[in-house]
Amino acid sequence: MIELDQTNIPKHVAIIMDGNGRWAKQKNKMRIFGHTNGVTAVRKAVAYARQIGVEVLTLYAFSSENWSRPEQEISALMSLFMQALDREVKKLHKNNICLKIIGDVSRFSETLQEKIKKAENLTEKNTALTLNIAANYGGCWDIIQAAKQIAEKVKKEEMSVSDINNSTFQHHLATQNAPPVDLLIRTSGEQRISNFLLWQIAYAELYFSDVLWPDFNQLEFNRAIASYQQRHRRFGGTE
């Protein structure tokens, strides 16, 4: 492990968890085998983020475009999601972690929506780490739904056009009052954003790992944080 500067830990880390299917294929297994092992990698990432003092960890679990996958895989993913909620929520609560599901959950089954609501209610006052799971999420969707919320408030005269600024717009995003993303990690060697947190990553540092998500461990997470700490963030300014 690389020794980290504890005064320069990113407040908000976001991860595009990519490579579950390829990992399973390498082992001649079904894709769901990769997704199942991906849950273990999530558990490790959450533990490490909490350990080093990250305030917010946002994980891209299921995009709004993922519905185009085979029906069998979608069904398996939904079952896995429910199982993970059942198994992990009490552990998250015990570790003082606040769980939030960001995305359009209305497309999920009523059973899954109820599990999400219970999990969020149980952990809402926890303060050690906020864990955002992006499910049926897309960055374009997020910006549009925020704009609609604001437009509705202006229409009802609950706010004026002059009230609209970066801060108020950010408050209406799915991530609400979370700080902007400092570090965006994508696994599996792919180098694209894939419609994830488009507003929130405006000045994020990007780190692309060749490791497939089920193999992403605390050592690889440590390397990503160390890389972040070596960079000079200018936020559009000069040296």
From Swiss-Prot:
InterPro entries documented for this protein: UPP_synth-like, UPP_synth-like_CS, UPP_synth-like_sf
Binding site for Mg(2+): D18, E205
A Pfam family matched in the record: Prenyltransf
GO CC terms in record: cytosol
Keywords from the named record: Cell shape, Cell wall biogenesis/degradation, Magnesium, Metal-binding, Peptidoglycan synthesis, Transferase
Active site: D18, N66
Family: Belongs to the UPP synthase family.
Subunit structure: Homodimer.
The protein, known as: Ditrans,polycis-undecaprenyl-diphosphate synthase ((2E,6E)-farnesyl-diphosphate specific)
Organism (species): Haemophilus influenzae (strain ATCC 51907 / DSM 11121 / KW20 / Rd)
